[in-house]
Amino acid sequence: MRKIIIGSRRSQLALTQTEWVISKLKEAGAPFDFEIKKIITKGDQILDVTLSKVGGKGLFVKEIEQAMANKEIDIAVHSMKDVPSVLQEGFALGATTTRVDPRDALISNEGYTLAELPAGSIVGTSSLRRSAQILAKRPDLEVKWIRGNIETRLRKLKEEDFDAIILAAAGLERMGWSNEIVTEYLDPDLCVPAVGQGALGIECRADDDEVLEMLKTINDDTTAKTVLAERTFLHRMEGGCQVPIAGYATLTDEGEIELTALVGTPDGEQIFKEILRGKDPVQLGETMAQALMDQGAKEVLEQVKKGLESQ
């Protein structure tokens, strides 16, 4: 019997997600043994600066893809929001799992919601997307960068000078912590989620037919379709650098995809937001990108990138 080696980052969340995928594959009747290989990524090692300054989200994927290319591992489980919008040649996205809660979650020391936080309160996030949207709603707040895994960020909220932090609800849910600690879930209308947020992406070698066949059993068609619209938009807009960009798609009762997309400046002073519907996910993502570019969003992203590079 073939043994499938699954590469995972070493954080508790990454391992929990990987174990969940193994359980789903076994439930679906996968005729293989499974083993987890822990991999340290560059993104896990550099914790003192924002992701955008050190190469963006691909930092969490590069070492794992290298291990796959070397055949040290067969598949990798990623949080979909960390997967670059275009995969390297030779790799394939074998499955997109059913999306769980896509929202951002606010956790505050005093139990204040976003609307209730006193002026001057310090909100911790590692995301320019969240920063742009939070400051657009509450320009009287201060955003400070916070890095590290969930446990580290929760500790920093208690020990350092943060009044609140914002994390992805999905990670908290997977760890079984959301009910205890979340002050407020931010509705997607208020804070548009990251592309792919709440879904897992399972990557494998493009020529591994046996694994590709196995992964089909846990692919969720609705999530795959909506995430494809989001990822197409992301690719057309900027292709992977970590910038203030958001995209969230749902399937309507009529079977259409509704895509909400947003581009902004990190200080929240300029926000471009659009909601469009369509049948074809790729076409919808491309149409959305063009709509925001026509409003001037591309120039804003270029300015943001230049600003980040000069810091």
Swiss-Prot record:
Its EC number is 2.5.1.61. CDD domains: PBP2_EcHMBS_like. Transmembrane segments: none annotated. One of its GO terms (molecular function) is hydroxymethylbilane synthase activity. Its cofactor is dipyrromethane. It catalyses: 4 porphobilinogen + H2O = hydroxymethylbilane + 4 NH4(+). It comes from the Bacteria. The modification S-(dipyrrolylmethanemethyl)cysteine is found at C241. GO terms for cellular component: cytoplasm. The keyword Transferase applies. InterPro entries: HemC, Porphobilin_deaminase_cofac_BS, Porphobilin_deaminase_N, Porphobilinogen_deaminase_C, Porphobilinogen_deaminase_C_sf. Belongs to the HMBS family. NCBIfam families: hemC. This is Porphobilinogen deaminase.
